[in-house]
Design a protein with these regions (language model features):
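Outer-membrane beta-barrel channel domains
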Residues: 30-282, 287-293, 356-368, 373-391, ...
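Exposed, low-structure sequence patches enriched in small/polar residues
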Residues: 4, 10-12, 186, 281-536
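Bacterial Sec-dependent N-terminal signal peptides
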Residues: 1-32
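Short, intrinsically disordered/low-complexity patches at protein termini
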Residues: 25, 168-170, 226-228, 237-239, ...
Length: 536
């Protein structure tokens, strides 16, 4: 990639702010629906209907006329307007603080997540003590702002402890400040400012995540890894939706240069175009580029204005004349029945046309997702379902320069399993009155790495295949993962998903080295619509 010019980060942010606040006024929708699969599946009936042409694959959603009725119904679920007591209304019906005027709106809530559990296999007690907050609102119809923060302490089952201790990071959230102790300690925030100057354009600046796809997982860009600073522009042009996003990512494993031991950083540039060919059929094209901020000698490059290019990238050289990590992908969706859609993703990392569909070449790395999801299964109202298959070849997402691996804080930006796996997922959700029930089954087969060898599962390792490997899924220490989870919850307040929840989890990871089993039951008072993944 030819180097055009460089700008320091502070000047870029200042320039962005000037652009955002200088665009002319217009009335348009700017409010986001917080993304999590458990909230997202409640929109199945409205967004997968054959009479709607909603762009379903870019999340979080902006509330528009198609999903507004469903969203409002979710926020009013179980609300009893006859309750007059201020205390009772705040507990069951309303935000803790809620102000609505013609010029602006504002709300704020306290967000507890208090759980106690027992792992009967490991004979250990687990717990979660989270105190959080959220506040948000609108200014006119153009601006939306939101922030939340969480202070956490908790004890996890052994398999999650092993994960956290390995990378010193609580999955999808933040650094563990306990330094290897059994009780983990961490905190993190989410913040966004959304501005819609005209109906066709939304500009979002924040510290958040983005999800691309119609499935439970995404091989292209998922919400598994931790939050990152981002600037996201989304253009809605009828049947075509186009998104370009720039992100500032952390690499926790690259060699550090400064005396404070701060992580090295990298830039991410992402493009996604979704085309609703008809109400039933849509196709999308995805492109991502990861580039180091400084080379291995500590030479800082700044932000290359080439990354602002709205045109999709191909293989290129970054500002340091080092290869960037460039990925491409496709999405597809077809509504085979009303409220029922089949969907797919194809990820292409390294491409070798003569060996694309076989496993014989480690220079050919790709991934595939196929699935079906829908609402009102067997004509039962609010019985929603998903069946999904994912597979990613060894060494996909990795890079010859480890700092440009497709990760943030050492966690995959795609599937939590990384690469070198096959995965089957089934999920059922049912809601009746104030009760919600969820059941999930996962099966995965993958190849783990023996000591000092690289068989392609760990996307943080450099792209240096172990001699004799073929690129076949499952190479290495062949491992089977069986996972089952169920929850039953009673909704207390729909505004921030305050609920009592009973949960159970069975997990069995088995290979030639032995078996790691978990049998966990939890109960607690929970809130928020966060996605907190532990099904890996």
């Amino acid at each position: 990639m030819q180097k055009i010019s460089l700008l320091p980060v502070r000047k870029i942010i200042s320039l962005i702010a000037v652009i955002i606040f200088s665009i002319g006024a217009s009335r348009a929708q700017s409010v986001y629906v917080p993304y999590s699969y458990q909230l997202d599946q409640q929109f199945n009936s409205s967004i997968y209907g054959i009479n709607t042409s909603f762009h379903t694959s870019l999340k979080p959603f902006l509330i528009d006329s198609i999903i507004a009725p469903t969203y409002n119904a979710i926020m009013q679920r179980g609300v009893d307007s006859s309750r007059k007591s201020w205390v009772v209304r705040k507990i069951f019906n309303e935000h803790l603080f809620d102000v609505k005027t013609k010029e602006f709106t504002f709300y704020a809530d306290y967000l507890p997540d208090l759980q106690l559990g027992r792992d009967f296999t490991g004979k250990t007690t687990t717990d979660m003590n989270t105190r959080g907050y959220q506040f948000g609102g609108t200014i006119g119809t153009k601006f939306f702002f939101y922030t939340s923060g969480f202070e956490n302490q908790g004890k996890f089952p052994p398999y999650l402890n092993d994960y956290i201790n390995k990378i010193n990071f609580v999955p999808g959230q933040a650094y563990d400040r306990s330094f290897g102790k059994s009780s983990k300690d961490w905190s993190y925030v989410t913040s966004i400012i959304s501005y819609t100057p005209i109906k066709q354009l939304n500009i979002t600046l924040g510290y958040d995540k983005t999800f691309i796809g119609d499935g439970y997982r995404s091989l292209l860009l998922s919400d598994f890894a931790a939050n990152y600073p981002l600037l996201r522009l989304t253009a809605n042009l009828g049947k075509v939706q186009y998104m370009i996003m720039w992100a500032y990512l952390d690499d926790a494993q690259a060699t550090k240069f400064d005396s404070f031991g701060n992580n090295r950083r990298k830039w991410g540039a992402f493009h996604y175009l979704d085309w609703n060919i008809s109400n039933r059929f849509s196709l999308g094209f995805f492109n991502a580029l990861i580039a180091e901020e400084a080379d291995d000698n500590g030479r800082y490059h700044g932000f290359d204005l080439n990354y602002i290019n709205p045109v999709f990238y191909s293989s290129s050289l970054g500002p340091s004349s080092q290869p960037d990590n460039v990925l491409a992908g496709f999405t597809g969706k077809y509504k085979i029945l009303d409220k029922t859609a089949i969907y797919a993703q194809l990820l292409i990392d390294r491409f070798n046309a003569g060996d694309f569909f076989s496993g014989g070449n480690t220079n050919n790395t790709n991934g595939l997702q196929v699935g079906i999801r829908g609402a009102d299964l067997f004509s039962v109202n609010k019985l929603n379902y998903l069946l999904e298959f994912n597979t990613v070849k060894p060494y996909t997402y990795s890079s010859s320069q480890p700092i440009t691996s497709y990760t943030n804080f050492s966690e995959p930006l795609g599937d939590p399993l990384g690469a070198n796996f096959r995965e089957f997922i089934g999920i059922l959700n049912y809601s009746v009155g104030r009760f919600d029930f969820m059941g999930q089954l996962n099966y995965a087969k993958y190849g783990l790495d023996p000591a000092s060898l690289n068989f392609g599962k760990d996307v943080n390792k450099p792209f240096i295949p172990t001699p004799g490997t073929t690129g076949s899924v499952g190479q290495g220490i062949a491992t089977n993962l069986y996972y089952a989870e169920g929850t039953a919850s009673l909704l207390i307040n729909p505004k921030y998903n305050l609920r009592f929840e009973l949960g159970g989890l069975l997990r069995d990871e088995t290979n030639s080295l032995g078996s790691k089993k978990t049998a966990l039951i939890t109960f607690g008072l929970r809130s928020t619509f966060r996605s907190l993944y532990h099904d890996f």
